[in-house]
Design a protein with these regions (language model features):
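Alpha-helical segment of the N-proximal tetratricopeptide repeat
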Residues: 18-51, 66-72
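Flexible helix-coil transition and linker loops at the boundaries of alpha-helical arrays
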Residues: 46-55, 86-95, 134, 138
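Structural signature of alpha-solenoid helical repeat junctions
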Residues: 18, 23, 56-57, 63, ...
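Residues within mature, well-folded domains
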Residues: 63, 70-76, 80, 92-95, ...
Length: 726
């Protein structure tokens, strides 16, 4: 690295200055016009003090890297900033300029080899929000990062951080904002097995792309940046244009006050892979930043304002119809929302052309009948028009009908006004559906790998030491493990068609701030031959121990091809993956004076089981009536009575939603049962068995189990729900 700096030494004569601060100011003054000369000055500064930080300009290494960047030596600039960050970190410092420049440039260049380090530096920037010495200049540098974060944060988290106030007022209004945002980002990490936060890296890559393509120098991010950061690259991106010869001849040539350059620029984005309602029209007026709008925002306002029955109003109506037909044609090609209205507009615009041609032909027929002495040779255009007139004949004049399009016949101005009014209502309704159905954030992380559908059920139990033990059972059908088209393609590329599989399940145990405490891993082989029959895999157990407060769990299940050609066999390409989060789990109450109860653990009831459980765990959310269902639970902190025994009542309530049949609403049916028990231990282990045979019309079922301590009078309850299939 320092060889690089020596290579920048372009002169053996020191500048006529007598301090590092003066040298630094001299170098800054040379930018951006003279980066090579500035680099020479900055090299001298860092050779004397590599960590020099100016009170006014910040770290000298930032400015040296900036000079290299302007000299198109991006790789050297990034390497220099990396070294600078490490040197300053050794002294407990973070230079905001270096950190911000490094994060921006890494992700703007999409330098994936540096994504991990870039994400770490970004988190250091967020941590600065808790620094009491944070100043306005630092907040100004953090502004784009905070703005992009505000687009994806859940509203509750944004409100807790008062992110809107932080962005607008450029001052911290709530304590612990940095810790809150860092904890939230840790919660978004989808793959606990890796050391990197892939979702954070994806976000920063999107922000880097937005900084490159969707930023106005004066006004910052436009609305395209917001949608891109939220949803990623669109399935289809179309630049909307009305620049074609037909419109020039039919519209712009006839209206001198209306010019092509006056029309707003437009883009149409479609996210078909997310939701059918995920479609966005962006409009840029007068070269201002793109903003979300509708197709009607792409028309000049003065064109829409004067539509009426007058000659001028009819002329504007015909122009609006033709421009809308062109725009709707481009929109309808990419989204069905605009299809029917495009048909109406295109049909009417075609009729306008035919009407004009008919009028033109009639005029030429009359002209032909009036002119008896024509020259032997006519110019080509006159001859063409006369030929057309003779072919068309004289159209019927008067009593002219307008195209009904299945509706009442309308002249141009009424048709245009109706199309505009109905179109605006239609697009407003589409925007409402979009707000309702399109997720706030969409990730593309797993698009290159098939999903692995698994069933999961967890239950919390209280251990003797007062900590909570969480038992997580998962399973999947044989069909779920079968490779799909994408997985088969990967198997073919690896030459492993017909291979068996290795399934790795990892349970990440996280503390309240989403820091990973422990990883629990289990692996099992899945044989290709076993997947040809119907059935499900035996439930696999993963267990987390030692929790005492708020905690979080993440389950990651990955399916690999198993390469048996090596000894020992090794995992091949990744074929399928799933990641499931369990946020904000609360440890059970360890206070011995408070009655407590475990979660309900569903079992496939088998009284012949010799295990501690009367059956095998049933992790599926759906039931059929042939499933012998049992619910196992444990009771803690029962109170001894005068006879040195515990006395408690267990009741359960089954709420079934049954199909009402033809013309009848679904109805809810409830059944209740109570049993009194006594024991000699403060901890009891119980289970109840449910008979599903009578649930012939049930569509869903909810079971509430209540335990009441007859000595202390305390009560505790747990609930579990299932869907029921015939």
């Amino acid at each position: 690295m320092w060889g690089l700096l020596l290579g920048l030494w372009l002169s053996s004569v020191n500048p006529p200055v007598d301090s590092l601060e003066q040298w630094l100011q001299q170098g800054v003054a040379l930018l951006p016009e003279h980066p090579a000369q500035a680099a020479t000055v900055f090299v001298q500064v860092v050779q004397i003090d590599s960590t020099y930080i100016s009170p006014r300009h910040g770290a000298a290494l930032f400015w040296l890297g900036q000079s290299l960047w302007l000299l198109d030596r991006q790789e050297e600039a990034l390497a220099l900033w990396e070294r600078g960050l490490a040197l300053l970190q050794q002294r407990g410092w973070v230079d905001v300029r270096i950190a911000d420049a490094y994060v921006r440039r890494v992700f703007m260049m999409q330098d994936r080899s540096r994504y991990g380090r870039g994400a770490q530096v970004y988190q250091q920037l967020l941590a600065l929000l808790d620094d009491p010495a944070l100043d306005t200049a630092t907040l100004q540098l953090l502004q784009p990062h905070l703005e992009a974060l505000s687009w994806i944060l859940p509203p509750a988290i944004a409100a807790r951080a008062d992110l809107a106030g932080l962005i607008q007022q450029k001052r911290i209004t709530r304590p612990g904002v940095g810790r809150l945002l860092l904890a939230w980002w840790r919660s978004q990490d989808p793959l606990p097995v890796t050391r990197r936060n892939e979702r954070l890296e994806e976000h920063l890559e999107r922000v880097g792309y937005a900084l490159t393509h969707f930023v106005d120098p004066d006004e910052g991010f436009d609305d395209r940046a917001r949608i891109y950061v939220r949803l990623g690259p669109p399935w289809r991106r179309v630049r909307l244009s009305v620049s074609n010869p037909w419109l020039r001849r039919k519209v712009f040539a006839r209206m001198p006050t209306l010019m092509e350059i006056q029309l707003p620029r437009g883009e149409f984005w479609v996210y078909r892979h997310i939701n059918r309602d995920a479609q966005y029209v962006f409009v840029s007026r007068d070269n201002k930043p793109y903003r979300l709008g509708t197709s009607f925002d792409l028309l000049p306002s003065r064109l829409l304002s004067g539509i009426g029955a007058t000659t001028r109003g009819q002329e504007k109506a015909r122009a609006a119809i033709r421009i809308l037909a062109e725009l709707y044609g481009q929109l309808a090609t990419n989204h069905p929302l605009f299809g029917l209205r495009y048909q109406d507009l295109a049909t009417y615009a075609l009729w306008l052309d035919e009407l004009e041609l008919a009028e033109e032909t009639a005029n030429w027929v009359r002209l032909r009948s009036q002119v008896t002495d024509l020259p032997d040779e006519l110019d080509p255009e006159t001859q063409r028009r006369l030929n057309m007139a003779e072919m068309m004949g004289v159209p019927v004049m008067g009593g002219m009908r307008y195209p009904g399009l299945g509706l009442a016949d309308q002249p141009p101005h009424l048709f245009a006004l109706r199309m505009i009014q109905e179109g605006k209502i239609e697009e407003d309704e589409a925007i409402m559906r979009r707000e309702e159905h399109v997720p706030r954030v969409y990730s593309n992380l797993f698009e290159d790998v098939e999903p692995l559908p698994v069933a999961v059920r967890l239950a919390r139990f209280l251990d003797a030491d007062g900590t909570t033990r969480t038992r997580l059972y998962w399973s999947a059908s044989n069909k779920a493990f079968q490779p799909g088209k994408l997985a088969q393609k990967r198997l073919r590329e690896a030459g492993m068609i017909g291979a068996d599989f290795l399934v790795t399940a990892t349970l990440a145990q996280r503390d309240e701030a989403y820091r990973t405490r422990t990883l629990h891993v289990r692996r099992q082989q899945v044989w290709q031959a076993d997947l040809n029959t119907e059935g499900v895999a035996a439930p696999m157990l993963l267990e987390a121990r030692g929790d005492t407060g708020l905690y979080h769990l993440v389950l990651q299940v990955s399916q690999f091809a198993l390469n048996r050609a090596t000894q020992p066999p090794r995992p091949g390409p990744l074929l399928k993956i799933t990641s499931i989060r369990f946020d904000s789990l609360q440890a059970l109450n360890a206070d011995p004076s408070v009655l407590e109860m475990s979660d309900l653990l569903p079992l496939w009831y088998d009284p012949a089981q010799n295990d501690t459980l009367p059956g095998r765990p049933y992790p599926f959310a759906r039931l059929t009536r042939d499933v012998p269902l049992a619910l196992y639970f444990e009771i803690y902190h029962l109170t001894f009575g005068a006879d040195d025994r515990t006395h408690y009542e267990v009741s359960y309530e089954v709420r079934r939603r049954e199909e009402g049949g033809l013309l009848r609403r679904d109805r809810e049916v409830q059944t209740t049962s109570r049993t009194v028990y006594e024991g000699t231990d403060r901890t009891a282990r119980e289970y109840i068995v449910l008979d599903l045979q009578d649930w012939k019309k049930a569509r869903s079922v909810e079971v509430v189990v209540r335990v009441r301590d007859l000595i202390s009078g305390q009560e505790v309850a747990r609930t579990i729900a299932f869907e029921v299939r015939s």
